[in-house]
Amino acid sequence: MQLPFGEWLPDQPNHLKQGANIAKNVYHAKQSYKPVKSLVPYSSNNIGSVCLGAGSFRDGSNNVFNFAASSTDIFQLASATFTSRKGSLTGDSTDYFTFTQFGNYVIVSNGVDAPQYYLMGTSTNFADLSAIATEGTPPTFKVSGVIRDFLVTGNQSSNTNRVQWSGINDITTWESGTKQSDLQDLPGSGGQIVHI
């Protein structure tokens, strides 16, 4: 038996409203609402310490890659098991990780250690991004994102209000003026860059 509930209308005035004010733990379905199911553990395995960042990415062949990071390691989750793909990191419990996908690359940084890359479908372990740099050296940064065809980084260890971007559609180029790669220090007292 289905019980009819009014449409969820939280923004409408209460006077003569025929809709619902509250819709907790449900999602909209055809002419009804369905309950959101309880969370269930995917795996009893864990990374062994506090997770400081995680990301899930899909490559060009639709394969999914799941990663999580602690202060000392970057792990890959596959078949319900975490496997270290990079160890010997030197950050502490306040150095959170940023995971960014650029094409089939996953770029990881915490602002302390050299930024890391993983080529989905090819790499076994993470490696320093500088290992594939052909022009210039990638900065050490806390935050990154993709804007159009550029990997954009910010909050560098040497300058917290600096943004720097790779060459156009090329994360191997970091030399200013080459393939449109460049950097910009943001003037004023706006503080450090916290997100891109």
Regions found by a protein language model. Give the residues of each.
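Beta-propeller fold detector
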Residues: 84-88, 127-132, 175-179
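N-terminal beta-propeller domains
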Residues: 1-82, 136-196
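Short hydrophobic/aromatic-rich beta-strand segments that constitute the beta-sheet cores
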Residues: 76, 84, 108-109, 117, ...
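Asp-box/WD-like beta-propeller blade repeats and closely related beta-sheet repeat scaffolds
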Residues: 120-145
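An acidic- and aromatic-residue-enriched active-site/binding cleft used to recognize and process polar
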Residues: 71-72, 111-113, 120-121, 156
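Generic beta-strand structural signal
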Residues: 69, 77, 101, 109, ...
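Predominantly a core beta-strand signature of beta-propeller blades
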Residues: 82-84, 115, 122-126, 183
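Elongated alpha-helical scaffolds
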Residues: 92-115
